[in-house]
Regions:
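Residue-level recognition of specific faces of alpha-helices
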Residues: 21, 36, 47, 63, ...
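Canonical helix-turn-helix DNA-binding module
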Residues: 48-82
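A positively charged, amphipathic N-terminal helix/segment that binds anionic biomolecules
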Residues: 2-3, 65, 87
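N-terminal helix-turn-helix DNA-binding core of bacterial DNA-binding proteins
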Residues: 16-56
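Amphipathic alpha-helical dimerization/coiled-coil segments
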Residues: 97-122
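N-terminal leader segment of winged-helix/HTH proteins
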Residues: 1-25
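A conserved beta-turn-beta hairpin within the catalytic core of GNAT-like acetyltransferases
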Residues: 11, 43-44, 83
Length: 122
């Protein structure tokens, strides 16, 4: 298994809080999943897999496990069928909302010249 997807404690790069946060959230998909939960509240595995960014099922499963292991998301009424499991943000996951909002504003301001089709901030 790819070390990045391992749910064991990360290899902390340094004592810097930004680097430590990125050790947990700095992959390509984690903040996209958090974004979806902020926008929609609760999401099922199937709903995540239908995201326009096109996350593969093996990466999705690993990311959900990773974010759950660090207490950022939690299962809601899990059942035997993994595709029907629903997830929601915990208080520590919800605390990322202003971070994502600011990242969205920054992207809209500074990346629009490079990516003219970038969506307006909602």
């Amino acid at each position: 298994m790819d070390k990045e997807l391992d749910t064991e404690a990360p290899d902390w790069r340094s004592v810097c809080p930004i680097a430590s946060g990125l050790d947990i959230l700095g992959d390509k998909w984690s903040l996209i999943l958090v974004r979806d939960l902020i926008q929609h509240g609760t999401r099922t595995y199937s709903q995540f897999s239908e995201s326009p960014e096109g996350i593969s099922t093996n990466i999705l499963a690993a990311r959900l496990k990773w974010l759950t292991s660090f207490g950022l998301i939690e299962h809601v009424d899990p059942d035997a069928a993994a595709r029907n499991n629903a997830y929601r943000l915990t208080p520590s996951g919800l605390a990322l909302r202003p971070v994502l909002e600011e990242l969205g504003r920054w992207s809209h301001t500074y990346l629009k010249p490079l990516h003219p089709d970038i969506a307006d901030i909602v």
